[in-house]
């Protein structure tokens, strides 16, 4: 419900919001809250302040936003399991940082750490040392175990009402988090390594009731909606780039040769499943770069007056998925710095931890051609090619 999420929840027939997660400005308190000495550099930020205000009211498991969210979702299933044609999204937010949970889960990972508080690590090179790094991993594991517990309640309810006979179940997440791997902590500031982008994904399809098997094909988050549309017998929009996962589920049939991924203003990346190619900007200025939007909001605030003063209205035919609706084109002067990492190529077969970039002009040329095609297929603006030094 932050500015950047405007109108998302209201597109559902019903929605429920659970407050108090992370730096949510939930409980009103003028005075700064008490908090322990910490290793985090966030301690003077408003999100840090709100988080520690909220923790004063989240002291038991049943008060945890995750518990309340899953409980609400389970209540929906309890009341609606006999109905047809329903869609439920349980968005737990966890195991997102801060990795705050209760002792019942912390005791699963005995920790002799006696240092300063560290359950909301800073993003950047890992400078915490061995003991603190191990501690934050245990904090993460504790929260992950809580997620496992509540996901188990969903599976139990699937069993209770035999929903497996006609209900699709999808378990996925948006991104990973680095906990000291390759000497990095956090996300967004480093290259898009496997720990960040190769995310867990589980799906059960009652039309193909296969259990306990893995698949080896490339898939992306954009493939979820076409899969759901097919399941509910809805024709997906013509401009949708994802593919139904049904062939993969049924017999491991591939649905794509490559996956294109990255972060705004950072590396543009492509993989064929073995090789990962990360293309950086061509120079430190990282230009030209624009944001395109019909709703000028960042995640937690509207675009500033200064930003909008530079905005121009884009050609209505620039993107066919906008159906000839105009969008703002806004210059961006600050973004993720990919130039300092340069362009990199990894072979996941011989180097799954991505510790040693390789140099192979034939593979790079091949992936460059595939990248250009996918960027065109995705209607990437022309300046994106210029930014990373590719000709269209």
Language model regions located:
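Polar, surface-exposed loop/tail segments
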Residues: 62, 66, 70, 165-167, ...
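Short catalytic/ligand-binding loop motif for oxyanion handling, primarily in non-cytosolic enzymes
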Residues: 1-4, 23-26, 84-85, 94-101, ...
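Histidine-centered active-site microenvironments of extracellular/periplasmic hydrolases
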Residues: 98-112, 157-220
